[in-house]
Each structure stands twice: as C-alpha cells, then as structure tokens.
Amino acid sequence: MEKPNMRNYYAIKVVGGQEINVALMLEERIKTNNIKGIYAIIVPPNLKGYVVLEAEGLHIVKPLIAGIRNARGLAQGLLPRDEILKIVSRKTVGPTVKPGDVVEVISGPFRGTQAQVIRVEEAKGEVVLNILESAFPLQVTVPLDQIKVSKR
C-alpha cells in the first residue's frame, strides 16, 4: 500500500469550487512551516471537489490539511500513478487544421465569423487567423478549441 520515502498521491476532498483556494492555503502552510516531503499540489480541472497532493506519506498529509478551511478530509487509499499522469498530461484540444483552411470562430469576440488559417501554433494550442469578413486584413490569435472547420 504505502511505501516509505516514496512519492504517493493522495486525494483531498474539498468544497466544490474552492479547489484553488485550498491549494493556495496548502502552499502557504508548506512554505511558512517549512514542511518537507510534499512534492506537488495538483488541482485537476476535470475533477471537481478534489485536490491531489504528491507526498511521502500520510504522516505528512494529515497534519497538513488539519484546520484548512474548505478541506473536508482525505479520500480513502492512494491514487495510482497512471491516473495522475492522465490528469496532468496535456491533451490536444480542438480540430486539426492546417494553413489555408477556412474555419468558423465559435466563441469569443469574433464568434460567428469566417476566417482563414494562416498558421497553427500547436505548442501553445493556438491558431492565427485572417478574418475574412472584415473591411481590412485583420489577423487574430485564437485558441484551437474556439474554432470549427468550415472548408478545407
């Protein structure tokens, strides 16, 4: 189950919507009390009501979360490492586009407008567009998840 001096992952139950606040309070407590053995505080965006701690053991985690506002306790057991890797790994979001494609912007200030792809910056998850419906050449950078392919 728990191995000494190993990095284990513990899920802390928190009030929904307060995950970032709890993570910030945990970070502050770790810094002010100079607590060793905590390696990471993870706030999973797709797992509401939980904060994950990477720590050496329960003997460090339990006193750390004691008295933290909006922290409701520990979830039973350890989280498997492969589950944590799924949570923290970056997934490519949005459609696959290439320069020259005509796309429609589906959210943001340019919602509903047609645009042509100039370049794709996959590392940033963004695409540079030339808005076709403007009176003058207008280039904007938009996240990939805010576009939908119209024509290739």
Swiss-Prot record:
Domain KOW, first and last residues per copy: 99-128
InterPro entries on file: KOW, NGN-domain, NGN-like_dom, NGN_dom_sf, Rib_uL2_dom2, Ribosomal_uL24_CS, Spt5_arc, Translation_prot_SH3-like_sf
GO molecular function, one term: structural constituent of ribosome
Pfam families from the UniProt entry: KOW, Spt5-NGN
A GO CC term attached to the entry: ribosome
Top-level division of the source organism's lineage: Archaea
GO annotation terms (biological process): regulation of DNA-templated transcription; transcription elongation-coupled chromatin remodeling
UniProt keyword annotation of Transcription present: yes
SUPFAM superfamilies, A to Z: Translation proteins SH3-like domain
Keywords, comma-separated and alphabetical: Transcription, Transcription regulation
Subunit structure comment from the entry: Heterodimer composed of Spt4 and Spt5. Interacts with RNA polymerase (RNAP).
Function: Stimulates transcription elongation.
Family to which the UniProt record says this protein belongs: Belongs to the archaeal Spt5 family.
Protein known as: Transcription elongation factor Spt5
